[in-house]
Structure formats: C-alpha cells, structure tokens
C-alpha cells in the first residue's frame, strides 16, 4: 500500500532486505497486537475467540498479565527491533552503494509505516468502538457491523 500510494517501487534487494522486513513486520504486527488489547473486553462479551489475549489466558495468565505480556512483546521485541533496523539502514545503504533517490524512497516507506503504526494507535485510543459504553449485547450490531448496515 505504501509503495502504491507513494507512487514508487523499492528494488527487490532493498524490499527484501532484513531491515526492511523487520520494519514491515512491525507495521503489521504492532497494530494487530494493540488491537488485541483494546478489543479484548468487547470481544469477550461477544464470545469472539480470535484474540491473542484469550490465547495467553488459556495458558493460565490473568487478563491483566496477558495485557502486560503483549505490551512487553511490543516494546521489547517489535519496537526495539524496529528502532535497530532503522538505525542499520544508513550502513546498509553505504555497503550496497544505494543511490540517493532510492534512499529517499526507503525513508518515505519507513516513515509511512511508522505513521501508520502511530495513527492506528491514536485511532484505537480515541474511537468509541473500544469504550465500555459501546460494548453492547452480542445479538446487536457493534461498531464494525454498523459500518456495513
């Protein structure tokens, strides 16, 4: 999506580079993990089961412990790996002799992924979908369903 909306391509040797894979994976997994925390209460009320919080609870952890485990995973693994990968890019570029135009595209790609993570996080903290007053009966439409009604 980033490449399409930015109207550029990354060369395969850049797109598949370990650092870019780490950055891309963070852009996918961090929002999913955060969503698991924010949506757990609503999904529990509805009887949904596809949430990592519930999987962790099945291992004998409390809900609060599951939240903490996920937060630690995000901070200690994903954010740390993302920061490390971004920090490695200049050396990686120098070693490959990457041209300035490609470096600019990679910078845009990385910044867009980071903005996506931040924007999704902000939306999750502000949307009414995750507020307790929006946790309505499982037999009635909720936030997502109301978008399609």
Regions found by a protein language model. Name each.
Residues 1-149:
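Alpha-helical, largely C-terminal catalytic domains
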């Amino acid at each position: 999506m980033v490449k399409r909306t930015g109207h550029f391509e990354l060369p395969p040797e850049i797109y598949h580079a370990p650092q870019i894979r780490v950055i891309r994976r963070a852009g996918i997994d961090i929002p999913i993990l955060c969503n698991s925390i924010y949506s757990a209460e609503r999904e529990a009320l509805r009887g949904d089961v596809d949430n990592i919080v519930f999987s962790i609870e099945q291992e004998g952890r409390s809900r609060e412990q599951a939240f903490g485990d996920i937060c630690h995973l995000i901070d200690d693994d994903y954010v740390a790996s993302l920061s490390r990968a971004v920090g490695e890019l200049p050396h990686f570029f120098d070693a490959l002799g990457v041209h300035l135009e490609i470096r600019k595209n990679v910078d845009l790609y990385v910044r867009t992924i980071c903005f996506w993570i931040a924007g999704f996080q902000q939306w999750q903290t502000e949307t009414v979908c995750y507020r307790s007053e929006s946790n309505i009966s499982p037999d009635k439409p909720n936030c997502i369903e109301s978008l399609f009604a």
